[in-house]
C-alpha cells in the first residue's frame, strides 16, 4: 500500500490461478479504503513483442483477466518482453481459438526470421502472408486474429490527453531498464494495443499516484 494506491504483486511462475484469486480477493477486502488497485506480474498478458502471443501467455491472460475485472483492478504492470507497450482500456476478453505451444513456436520462428540483413532491428518482418496456401500458416494467422480481443476494447471519455474514470483495465508492459536484453515487436500490432515502442535502449516507466 502506498498512499491511496494498493499494489498487489503476483508470482505467476506459480500457475495455481485459484491461489492468485484468493490472494487478490483477500487483499482487496483488507484495503477497501484504497482508491487505486494496481497488480504487477511478470508475463505480458497484453503485450506486443515476440512472447506476447504465445499460447502459454494468452492462456494465462484469459484465466487472470476475469479475476482482475471482478476485483476492480485499475492497472496491470508487466514485463517479460523487454519492449514497452500500453493497452487500450479492456474489459471482457475471451479466448476463441485453441492452439498449442509447439505449433505456435514453429510458425513464430518462420514468421519473425529477419535473415542476415534485417530491414529493421526492432520490428519483426512478418514472413507469413494472409494469402499463404499453407494450412499451418492459415491456422497460425487465425489464432493471432482470435487473440486480438477487439470486442474487449472500451470506449473512453477524454479530457485533453487524460482518460476520465474509464471502464476496464489498463495493461502496461515495461521496457528493459538494464539493457541486458531486448525483443522485437511483433509484425502485426494487436488491436488491443494503444501504443508500443522499441528502440533497443534502456528505458523506465513512472507511475504518479
Where are these regions (language model features)?
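Serine-hydrolase catalytic core recognition
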Residues: 1
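Long, structured stretches of catalytic cores involved in phosphate-ester chemistry, encompassing
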Residues: 4-6, 17-22, 31-208
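Short histidine/acidic/glycine/proline-rich micro-motifs that form metal-
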Residues: 14
Amino acid at each position: 500500500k502506498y498512499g491511496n494506491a494498493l499494489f498487489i504483486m503476483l508470482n505467476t511462475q506459480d500457475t495455481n490461478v485459484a491461489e492468485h484469486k484468493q490472494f487478490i480477493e483477500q487483499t482487496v477486502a483488507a484495503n477497501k479504503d484504497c482508491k487505486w488497485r494496481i497488480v504487477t506480474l511478470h508475463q505480458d498478458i497484453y503485450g506486443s513483442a515476440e512472447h506476447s502471443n504465445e499460447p502459454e501467455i494468452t492462456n494465462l491472460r484469459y484465466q487472470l483477466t476475469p479475476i482482475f475485472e471482478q476485483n476492480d483492478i485499475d492497472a496491470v504492470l508487466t514485463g517479460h518482453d523487454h519492449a514497452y507497450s500500453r493497452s487500450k482500456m479492456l474489459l471482457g476478453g475471451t479466448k476463441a481459438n485453441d492452439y498449442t505451444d509447439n505449433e505456435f513456436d514453429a510458425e513464430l520462428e518462420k514468421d519473425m526470421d529477419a535473415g542476415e540483413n534485417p530491414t529493421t532491428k526492432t520490428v519483426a518482418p512478418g514472413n507469413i502472408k494472409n494469402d499463404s496456401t499453407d494450412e499451418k500458416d492459415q491456422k497460425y494467422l487465425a489464432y493471432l486474429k482470435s487473440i486480438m480481443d477487439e470486442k474487449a476494447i472500451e470506449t473512453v471519455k477524454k479530457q485533453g490527453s487524460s482518460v476520465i474514470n474509464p471502464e476496464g483495465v489498463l495493461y502496461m508492459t515495461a521496457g528493459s531498464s538494464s539493457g541486458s536484453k531486448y525483443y522485437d515487436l511483433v509484425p502485426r500490432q494487436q488491436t488491443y494495443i494503444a501504443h508500443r515502442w522499441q528502440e533497443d535502449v534502456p528505458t523506465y516507466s513512472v507511475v504518479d499516484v
